[in-house]
């Protein structure tokens, strides 16, 4: 599904990613961990298509297509979803209008018929019930006045509606209390269907107690220096990153 080979990325002429390689197959959950400044969020931003991140080497393919040649909008159309650490607030735009516009843009890109407001309302009722979310979430402005937990619920709702093939969560657990953390975990777990893949970028181990990843990767100085299964999370929890960084 996603194949990253020897990726090099710079920001303001400073090299951040220095030869990162990663393969993600359908249905897999990959956790990306590492100390501050290791390049975790740079990887997320690059996959999402942020313009201020300059790819200076390597390749990224998604479903056989050159991802780096696609605009952020086309990446969304191809099935990539990005949940940012700090979701954007959009005053005056209701969640329902935002989601219908986003979904119909994706459907148009794929050559599918767009949904009118009645069909979309039926879809929203189904997703709201599935995720056990409050219905008033739809009438409120996008993320305006939302608590941390409500913003994360909104991310999960967007994922459920857009049905992406690859979901990237960029430090979505940062600053959350345990209840909000469980909202994120429950939402992700409810969307795991054996086909949809996830990349969970996190500085902490605690969210991975609720979302058990198939693979765990440690990023350090712009490269993946260690990969393993969930036991690597426990090892990092007990020993920190020092034992890995000292080997580099």
From Swiss-Prot:
GO terms for molecular function: ATP binding; ATP hydrolysis activity. This is Probable ATP-dependent transporter SufC. SUPFAM superfamilies: P-loop containing nucleoside triphosphate hydrolases. Residues 2-246 form the ABC transporter domain. It comes from Escherichia coli (strain K12). ATP binds at residues 34-41. The keyword Nucleus does not apply. Its main location: cytoplasm. The keyword Cytoplasm applies. Has low ATPase activity. The SufBCD complex acts synergistically with SufE to stimulate the cysteine desulfurase activity of SufS. The SufBCD complex contributes to the assembly or repair of oxygen-labile iron-sulfur clusters under oxidative stress. May facilitate iron uptake from extracellular iron chelators under iron limitation. One of its GO terms (cellular component) is iron-sulfur cluster assembly complex. NCBIfam families: PRK09580.1, sufC. It is found in: Cytoplasm. Part of the SufBCD complex that contains SufB, SufC and SufD. Interacts directly with SufB and SufD. Interacts with SufA. It holds the Pfam family ABC_tran. InterPro entries: AAA+_ATPase, ABC_transporter-like_ATP-bd, ABC_transporter-like_CS, FeS-cluster_ATPase_SufC, P-loop_NTPase. The gene is sufC. Keywords: ATP-binding, Cytoplasm, Nucleotide-binding, Transport. GO terms for biological process: iron-sulfur cluster assembly; response to radiation.
